[in-house]
Amino acid sequence: MGTPPGLQTDCEALLSRFQETDSVRFEAFTELWRNMKFGTIFCGRMRNLEKNMFTKEALALAWRYFLPPYTFQIRVGALYLLYGLYNTQLCQPKQKIRVALKDWDEVLKFQQDLVNAQHFDAAYIFRKLRLDRAFHFTAMPKLLSYRMKKKIHRAEVTEEFKDPSDRVMKLITSDVLEEMLNVHDHYQNMKRVISVDKSKPDKALSLIKDDFFDNIKNIVLEHQQWHKDRKNPSLKSKINDGEEKMEGNSQETERCERAESLAKIKSKAFSVVIQASKSRRHRQVKLDSSDCDSASGQGQVKATRKKEKKERLKPAGRKMSFRNKGNVQNIHKEDKPLSLSMPVITEEENESLSGTEFTASKKKRKH
């Protein structure tokens, strides 16, 4: 959806009338707002979808005049227009003002200019919008989508509201500076002619400073450089980064020199080694040998203690009888999974079985 017909014309008419007042006060803007009945711009039979789209377009149009290259007065009027449109809209919830992140730095600079110029009514309006969370921060100024058009329509800048690039340079050109220099030289020569001493003019005739032209020239050059830095802040940041790098390199060289001096001092200190006397060496060796003996003795004691613990923890199976061993083996066999092999009968079991069969046959005979 494009800009609704008549909306841009009405906004420009309101801003042009505000420009004619030659003021940035909020009272002057509200008077024009009431006279034009601008609050009824959202009235009419519209569905919710159309209402939301119309409000978005109105806020986007007003935001366009809030950014450069428009004059300071037009930007203040656009701020008041945004405030009025945001608070008189009929959408629920309210549509927010779409702000691209790349434009936010310029907005903060404008806020600081308002505070420095003591335009507190405009600064209050901007702060009120921020507190009401009227801004919707986005990556791009417009909502992007897939388009088949090769050429994208760009908004035209209104020349009436546009801020001149540099008024100082238009006023003081190179021709004007040259003419001022000629006038200044002629003035100095005339003072010498009138004065008694032809080499030096009288002090009574020195109504202006001798370096008047040089001061004007330096001021113009400083203003020109400031204007360039304002247009291209990246160049200024690069210059500052270069200065910081130079300072960092100088600090690194100082650190390297300190480190080298400390290394030299340490090398000198450790190069001179104090040798101990023979008696001390002998004592030291003895002490080392005693330490080794004590360490070996402690190791042997630990080994014997470990052996004793192992002997204590040995199972009492050695004291068990042969039958108990058999029972233990049978218990372990029961724990194991069943196998399909035939059972193995030992000799002792054969003897016991034969004995039981013999006694059983004797009892039968007795009966």
Swiss-Prot record:
<feature type="modified residue" description="Phosphoserine">
    <location>
        <position position="289"/>
    </location>
</feature>
<feature type="modified residue" description="Phosphoserine">
    <location>
        <position position="290"/>
    </location>
</feature>
<comment type="subunit">
    <text>Part of the SNAPc complex composed of 5 subunits: SNAPC1, SNAPC2, SNAPC3, SNAPC4 and SNAPC5. SNAPC1 interacts with SNAPC3, SNAPC4 and TBP.</text>
</comment>
<dbReference type="GO" id="GO:0042795">
    <property type="term" value="P:snRNA transcription by RNA polymerase II"/>
</dbReference>
<feature type="region of interest" description="Disordered">
    <location>
        <begin position="228"/>
        <end position="254"/>
    </location>
</feature>
<keyword id="KW-0238">DNA-binding</keyword>
<feature type="compositionally biased region" description="Basic and acidic residues">
    <location>
        <begin position="238"/>
        <end position="254"/>
    </location>
</feature>
<keyword id="KW-0597">Phosphoprotein</keyword>
<dbReference type="GO" id="GO:0019185">
    <property type="term" value="C:snRNA-activating protein complex"/>
</dbReference>
<feature type="region of interest" description="SNAPC4-binding">
    <location>
        <begin position="164"/>
        <end position="268"/>
    </location>
</feature>
<dbReference type="InterPro" id="IPR019188">
    <property type="entry name" value="SNAPC1"/>
</dbReference>
<dbReference type="GO" id="GO:0005654">
    <property type="term" value="C:nucleoplasm"/>
</dbReference>
<comment type="function">
    <text>Part of the SNAPc complex required for the transcription of both RNA polymerase II and III small-nuclear RNA genes. Binds to the proximal sequence element (PSE), a non-TATA-box basal promoter element common to these 2 types of genes. Recruits TBP and BRF2 to the U6 snRNA TATA box.</text>
</comment>
<keyword id="KW-0804">Transcription</keyword>
<keyword id="KW-0805">Transcription regulation</keyword>
<dbReference type="GO" id="GO:0042796">
    <property type="term" value="P:snRNA transcription by RNA polymerase III"/>
</dbReference>
<dbReference type="Pfam" id="PF09808">
    <property type="entry name" value="SNAPC1"/>
</dbReference>
<protein>
    <recommendedName>
        <fullName>snRNA-activating protein complex subunit 1</fullName>
    </recommendedName>
</protein>
<feature type="region of interest" description="SNAPC3-binding">
    <location>
        <begin position="1"/>
        <end position="168"/>
    </location>
</feature>
<feature type="region of interest" description="Disordered">
    <location>
        <begin position="278"/>
        <end position="367"/>
    </location>
</feature>
<dbReference type="GO" id="GO:0043565">
    <property type="term" value="F:sequence-specific DNA binding"/>
</dbReference>
<dbReference type="GO" id="GO:0005730">
    <property type="term" value="C:nucleolus"/>
</dbReference>
<feature type="compositionally biased region" description="Polar residues">
    <location>
        <begin position="292"/>
        <end position="301"/>
    </location>
</feature>
<keyword id="KW-0539">Nucleus</keyword>
